[in-house]
UniProtKB/Swiss-Prot annotation:
Keywords: Cell membrane, Cytoplasmic vesicle, Endosome, Exocytosis, Golgi apparatus, Membrane, Protein transport, Synapse, Transmembrane, Transmembrane helix, Transport. Interacts (via C-terminal part) with SYT1 and SYT2; interaction with synaptotagmins making a link with the SNARE molecules. Interacts with SLC9A7. It comes from the Eukaryota. Pfam families: SCAMP (PF04144). Expressed both by neuronal and non-neuronal tissues. Expressed in brain, stomach, thyroid, spinal cord, lymph node, trachea, adrenal gland, bone marrow and in the different parts of brain. In thyroid tissues, it is expressed by the follicular epithelial cells. In the adrenal gland tissues it is detected in the zona fasciculata of the cortex region (at protein level). Residues 61-67, 126-148 are extracellular. This is Secretory carrier-associated membrane protein 5. It comes from Homo sapiens (Human). The keyword Nucleotide-binding does not apply. GO terms for biological process: exocytosis; negative regulation of endocytosis; positive regulation of calcium ion-dependent exocytosis; positive regulation of cytokine production; protein transport; response to endoplasmic reticulum stress. The lineage of its organism: Eukaryota, Metazoa, Chordata, Craniata, Vertebrata. It is a multi-pass membrane protein. GO terms for molecular function: protein-containing complex binding. GO terms for cellular component: Golgi membrane; membrane; plasma membrane; recycling endosome membrane; synaptic vesicle membrane; trans-Golgi network membrane.
C-alpha cells in the first residue's frame, strides 16, 4: 500500500511549509458517509469565509468612525478560529466517520457545541468584540449608513452559519444515536486506548468499508418474465 502523503492545506510551493493533514473523502470515508462529511467540510469553509468577510466589515466599521479594537479582534478571530475550527471539530468528525469511533464523535459534539455558541454570539454582535453582528450593525446605521450596509453582509452570514451549525449538529447526533453510539462506548474506547490505536482504527475502517461495499454488491433476486408451470400427470 502506497504511503499517504499529507495534502491539506494545499499550500503554494513558494511557502516553506508542508501540509499537516491527509484528506481524501473517497479513499478514507465509507461511501454512505461521504456526503455528510463533505457537507461538514463545506460548513467549515463557510465559517472561514464568514470570518474573512467579517474582517472587511470591521474595516468598514473603522473607516465609518468605529474603533480600531474591532478590526484588530476581527483579524485575530480570522487567524485563530480558521485553523482551530478545522483541528478541533472537523478533524474529529472526519476521523469519526472514517473509523467509526465513538470517542471521536464525542470530541466532535463537545467542540461543535462550542462552535454553535460562538456562532450565535457572533450573530448577536456585541460591540467591541470584533464581530459585525445585529446589535453592532443596527446601532451603527445612525452613524454611517454606508459602513452599516457593508457590516450587514457578515451579520447575515454569521446568522446563516449559526442556523446551519444547529442543523448539522442535529443531523450528526441523530445519525450517531441511530447507529447505536453512546457515551459509554466512548468511555470504553478511552479506557482501552482504542481511540489512538492505529491498528484498531484501520480494522474499523476496513470493516465499515467492507460493509458498505457488501451492501452495494448484494445480489438481487431476479425473476423470469415467463411463468413456469409444473403439471402433474395424475388426474
Amino acid at each position: 500500500m502506497a504511503e499517504k502523503v499529507n495534502n491539506f492545506p494545499p499550500l503554494p510551493k513558494f511557502i516553506p511549509l508542508k501540509p499537516c493533514f491527509y484528506q481524501d473523502f473517497e479513499a478514507d470515508i465509507p461511501p454512505q458517509h461521504v456526503s455528510m462529511t463533505k457537507r461538514l467540510y463545506y460548513l467549515w469553509m463557510l465559517n472561514s469565509v464568514t470570518l474573512a468577510v467579517n474582517l472587511v466589515g470591521c474595516l468598514a466599521w473603522l473607516i465609518g468612525g468605529g474603533g480600531a479594537t474591532n478590526f484588530g479582534l476581527a483579524f485575530l478571530w480570522l487567524i485563530l478560529f480558521t485553523p482551530c475550527s478545522y483541528v478541533c471539530w472537523f478533524r474529529p468528525i472526519y476521523k469519526a466517520f472514517k473509523t467509526d469511533s465513538s470517542f471521536s464523535f464525542m470530541a466532535f459534539f463537545f467542540t461543535f457545541m462550542a462552535q454553535l455558541v460562538i456562532s450565535i454570539i457572533q450573530a448577536v454582535g456585541i460591540p467591541g468584540w470584533g464581530v459585525c453582528g445585529w446589535i453592532a450593525t443596527i446601532s451603527f446605521f445612525g452613524t454611517n449608513i454606508g459602513s452599516a450596509v457593508v457590516m450587514l453582509i457578515p451579520t447575515v452570514m454569521f446568522t446563516v452559519m449559526a442556523v446551519f451549525s444547529f442543523i448539522a449538529l442535529s443531523m450528526v447526533h441523530k445519525f450517531y444515536r441511530g447507529s447505536g453510539g453512546s457515551f459509554s462506548k466512548a468511555q470504553e474506547e478511552w479506557t482501552t486506548g482504542a481511540w489512538k490505536n492505529p491498528h484498531v482504527q484501520q480494522a474499523a475502517q476496513n470493516a465499515a468499508m467492507g460493509a458498505a461495499q457488501g451492501a452495494m454488491n448484494q445480489p438481487q433476486t431476479q425473476y423470469s418474465a415467463t411463468p413456469n408451470y409444473t403439471y402433474s400427470n395424475e388426474m
